[in-house]
Amino acid sequence: MHFLLEICVDTYGSAVAAIQGGADRLELCSALSEGGLTPTVGLLRQIKQYLSEHDPPKTIPVYCMIRCRRGSDFSYSEQEMNVMLWDLQLLAQHGADGFVFGALESSSGKVHLEHCGQIVAAAGKLPLTFHRAIDCTDEQRLEENLNLVAQLGFSTVLTSGLKPTAEQGIDTIAKMKAIATDIEKVTGKSLRLMPGSGISSENALKVIQRTGCDAIHGSASVVKSSDNETRTLPMGASNVDALPLKVCSTAKVQELRRSIDSIVKK
């Protein structure tokens, strides 16, 4: 059995590091410091070019985040939806292999059928992951929301089990996995649960074994060392630009890969 390792990246260098480290799939974003926003077409094209230049070409899927702004409400206006639908169309035209999206109703916290349905329709046959918007929903509506996600046509749910980290939400993820199994038995719709947030080589094995999931998501990042002596200034109210830059580490990805692959060997 092969366990899927997805690495989220927001720079070209991080994408290359993830690929070289053994990632099975990339979640491509911009601004991971903001939780991940829609990436640029230029970044996607550069990564796809890197993959195509190998002999034979590497076939690592690149799923693009569709999220036009920061914020944990995941409730969007009609105009914001139009922005994201345009972005999706452009990214699909330039080689995106799948998309990552989530939207909730502002009044109920329920999965937004209309907005998610628009994205599913625009994606066509390309697969979709419902992102950690699911972690901002009410636990009492978890079964209902997972059924809606499956009904819409999403193939994967990225989750930390409604907690800040997947390790903290491990019991809820196991519950979600059981719900997904029941959904498939009743409807025939397969919904893969993929734990993410705070995943490392130290806890990946525990999370997979305790939840029964066959996929895991992480950033495998380290603080980038820099000899740059340029004076730093805040470029916004949050002062994020003054913080150290985090990038994907090939060594960290390899550690994660070895950790989850050890399950198969046991």
Predicted feature locations:
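N-terminal pre-domain/capping segments
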Residues: 1-26, 31-38
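Glycine-rich phosphate-binding active-site loops on the catalytic face of alpha/beta enzymes
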Residues: 24-37, 90, 94-108, 152-167, ...
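Active-site-adjacent beta->alpha loops and helix N-cap segments on the catalytic face
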Residues: 12-16, 32-53, 60, 78-81, ...
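Short helix-terminating capping/connector loops at secondary-structure junctions
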Residues: 1-2, 55-59, 185-190
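Hydrophobic faces of well-ordered beta-strands that scaffold small-molecule active sites
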Residues: 3-9, 26-28, 62-66, 99-101, ...
